[in-house]
Amino acid sequence: FTLMNQDSEMIDLASFKGKKVILEWTNHDCPFVKRHYDTDNMQELQREYTDNDVVWLSIISSAEGKQGYVTKSEAKELTTSRNAQPSHVLFDSNGDVGRLYDAKTTPHMYVIDEKGLLRYQGAIDNLGVTGALFSTDLSKAKNYVRNAMNSLFLGEEVAEKNTRPYGC
C-alpha cells in the first residue's frame, strides 16, 4: 500500500523491504489508545524499536467528519504533545488499507519481517482477555508486539501469530 503521511509525502510499504515494520492502527479519541499513550506504553515501544532501525507506521483510518479524524497538522501536534515517535503517521481516510488488513479496532497491531511477511497481527497486549480490559496498570500485561519483535530479533518463529484485537 501507499499512503500520504503527516508531511504530505507518499509512503510505500514496499519501500521498507529489508526492515522490520510495525503497523499501529490508531485513533486518538479511543480510550484504549489513550491508555497506551497516557501511560507512555506506546511511546516506549516506538522508541525501543525505531532506535533499533524498525519502521513504525501509525495509521489513521478515520474519515473527515468521523470520530478520530485528524488533519495533518493535528497529527503532528498529537505526535509532539504525546512525545510519540512513529516513523510516519499515515492517513487512510477512505479505509481501504484498513479493510485490506482487516483492521478492526484501535489499537490493532501488525508486525512485518524484513521479507515483507506478516508475522503477528492482533492486540497490543493480553488485557482484552484477562478481565483487566480497563486497567491502567500495564506492568503485568503480556505485550504481544514486544514478544513478536523479540522473536524476530532472535531469529525465532513468532509463537503467537494472531490474537484477538480489542479497542474501539
Task: Give short role names for the model-derived ranges.
Residues 1-21:
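A short beta-strand-turn-helix
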Residues 76-113, 118-119:
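Short, internal strand/loop/helix patches
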Residues 34-82, 93-100:
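Structural microenvironment flanking redox-active thiols in thiol-disulfide oxidoreductases
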Residues 113-168:
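Thiol-/selenol-based redox modules, centered on thioredoxin-like
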